[in-house]
């Protein structure tokens, strides 16, 4: 009967809309990446040609080399995003786990990002780091989660802003938390920021870089580890993202 078929038709219609939406976002992503790949490549080619042909003045060579270095780093970042996108759908088959010390991984990541934070005039530090916060997880994936959360907090911050990374125990859980006092996220966007390709402020994203995949990767990895994500954000005041892991004895 119609009543019996209707739920299936509604489900198919909903899936069709989701596929169209995903396809549109993928097209926007491809167009954006194509543009962003060309920009640093053109910069590298242009500055390198000036140096190679001897047209660069001696005092300009160091500046040109610096610009080439910046553009090369931008290219590397884009390529890494594209690789991560291709890996999202195969992560399900690669979840080999071991005992991972969250406190050690957070300290290591914060140390690694110090120089990048300083370039953006941002202070990044560990806040609460409890010992023996051990989870059963894929170490590389956990490193990716911590890096993406901290990198986003640096990227979308204010001048002279702060980023704090914490690991602590609460009830029967171990919580990884990254907090910033940056620009915050509009309430209407909170439910969408973990979607693939989604970027809250496209104009700002073009300035800061990134392809809108970082938080999608975080969400996917969290789901793989049966972890819960909580986000609290106030526009103009900052954002706190918490990943709640079950303890090993649960």
Language-model region placement:
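Short conserved segment of the HATPase_c
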Residues: 185-199
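Short acidic helix/loop segment immediately C-terminal to the autophosphorylated histidine
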Residues: 52-59
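Short beta-strand/loop element within the Bergerat-fold HATPase_c
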Residues: 160-172
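Short alpha-helical segment of the dimerization/phosphotransfer core of two-component systems
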Residues: 70-76
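Conserved glycine-rich
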Residues: 226-227
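Conserved micro-motifs of the catalytic ATP-binding
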Residues: 90-95, 134-137
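Conserved catalytic submotifs in the C-terminal HATPase_c
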Residues: 96-101, 118, 123-133
């Amino acid at each position: 009967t119609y009543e019996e078929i209707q739920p299936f038709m509604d489900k198919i219609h909903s899936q069709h809309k989701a596929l169209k939406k995903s396809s549109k976002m993928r097209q926007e992503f491809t167009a954006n990446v194509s543009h962003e790949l060309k920009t640093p490549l053109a910069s590298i080619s242009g500055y390198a040609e000036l140096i190679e042909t001897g047209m660069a003045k001696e005092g300009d060579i160091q500046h040109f080399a610096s610009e080439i270095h910046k553009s090369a780093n931008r290219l590397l970042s884009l390529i890494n995003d594209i690789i991560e996108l291709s890996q999202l759908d195969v992560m399900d088959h690669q979840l080999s786990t071991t005992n991972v010390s969250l406190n050690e991984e957070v300290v290591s990541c914060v140390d690694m990002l110090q120089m990048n934070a300083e370039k953006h005039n941002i202070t990044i530090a560990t806040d609460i780091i409890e010992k023996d916060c051990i989870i059963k997880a894929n170490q590389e994936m956990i490193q990716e989660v911590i890096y993406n959360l901290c990198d986003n907090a640096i990227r979308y911050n204010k001048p002279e802003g702060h980023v704090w990374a914490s690991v602590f125990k609460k009830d029967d859980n171990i919580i990884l938390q990254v907090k910033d006092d940056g620009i915050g996220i509009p309430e209407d966007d909170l439910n969408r920021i973990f979607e693939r390709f989604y970027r809250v402020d496209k104009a700002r994203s073009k300035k800061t870089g990134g392809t809108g995949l970082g938080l999608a990767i975080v969400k996917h990895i969290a789901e793989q580890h049966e972890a819960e994500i909580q986000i609290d954000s106030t526009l103009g005041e900052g954002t706190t993202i918490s990943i709640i892991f079950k303890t090993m004895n649960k």
